[in-house]
A protein has these predicted regions:
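Conserved alphaE helix
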Residues: 75-86
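Hydrophobic residue at the +6 position relative to the catalytic HRD Asp in the kinase catalytic loop
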Residues: 100-110
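Flexible, glycine- and charge-enriched loops at secondary-structure boundaries
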Residues: 11-18, 73-77, 134
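Conserved ATP-binding subdomain of kinase catalytic cores across diverse folds
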Residues: 1-63, 85-93, 97
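Short, glycine/acidic-enriched loop or turn micro-motifs at the edges of active sites
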Residues: 60, 102, 126
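A short, glycine/Asx- and small/polar-enriched loop/turn
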Residues: 48-52, 113-118
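C-lobe/activation-segment region of protein kinase-like
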Residues: 117-196
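AlphaC helix of the protein kinase catalytic domain
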Residues: 64-73
C-alpha cells in the first residue's frame, strides 16, 4: 500500500526505523548487550524521505529463543533458565524490548561465558531505555509466551532481579492470561477492523 501523503510527511519528521535501530545497536553494545554488529543505516530522500534500511553483520549458527518453548532436551532447560537471567539483566540495565518475541532473541552456545549460553537481540527499533519496574518487567517477560521450562525461565529472571518467585509466578500467569485474551479479541475482530480500514 502506498502511504498517505500526510503519513509520509509525519514519518519524515521523526527518525527512521533504520536510524533508530542503528543508534540502539550502538547503545546496546556500549552496555555490553549482544546484538549483531551495526554496519550502516541508509536513508533515501527525494524532498521527503522515500526509504530507509539498516545493515548489520549476520550471526551464523544461532537459533531463536522460540525454539526453546517446546524443547524437552535438558540443554533447553538450562538455556531457558539462562534466558530468564538475560532478560532480567536487560531490565536491570533499563533496556525494555517492546517486541520481545521468541524470534527477536537469538541463542548461541558459548562455553566461554558463565552461563554457557549467549543471547543476542534483533529487531531493535522498538527498544526503549527506561527504568523497568517489577510489573513492567514481568509484563515484558510474558510477551515471550509459555515455555516447557517456564519455571526455569522465571527462576533465572527472579534470581537476576532479586524478586520473590511466588509473586513473580503469579503475576506472570496473570499477564499470560491477559495476553491470550487480548490475542483472542484481536484475531476475532480482524474482519471488522479490515472492513473499517483499521
Amino acid at each position: 500500500a502506498v502511504p498517505h501523503p500526510l503519513g509520509r510527511l509525519l514519518n519524515t519528521l521523526r527518525s527512521s526505523k533504520a536510524l533508530r535501530s542503528f543508534d540502539i545497536a550502538v547503545r546496546l553494545l556500549d552496555l555490553g548487550v549482544s546484538t549483531p554488529e551495526p554496519l550502516a543505516a541508509v536513508e533515501t530522500w527525494k524532498g521527503l524521505r522515500t526509504g530507509a534500511f539498516y545493515c548489520c553483520r549476520w550471526h551464523t549458527h544461532w537459533s531463536r529463543a522460540r525454539e526453546l518453548r517446546a524443547d524437552f532436551d535438558p540443554r533447553a532447560e538450562h538455556a531457558t533458565w539462562a534466558l530468564g537471567v538475560f532478560i532480567g539483566h536487560l531490565h536491570n540495565l533499563g533496556v525494555l524490548h517492546r517486541d520481545l518475541s521468541g524470534g527477536n532473541v537469538l541463542v548461541g552456545g558459548d562455553p566461554s561465558t558463565p552461563l554457557g549460553v549467549t543471547f543476542s537481540l534483533i529487531d531493535l527499533n522498538r527498544i526503549r531505555f527506561t527504568s523497568v519496574g517489577r510489573r513492567m518487567g514481568i509484563a515484558n517477560l510474558a510477551v515471550l509466551g509459555h515455555f516447557h521450562y517456564t519455571a526455569q525461565l522465571l527462576d533465572g529472571y527472579c534470581r537476576e532481579r532479586r524478586l520473590s518467585p511466588s509473586w513473580t509466578c503469579s503475576r506472570y500467569e496473570t499477564m499470560l492470561g491477559v495476553r491470550r485474551l487480548r490475542d483472542t479479541i484481536w484475531s476475532g475482530t480482524r474482519p471488522l477492523r479490515r472492513t473499517l480500514g483499521l
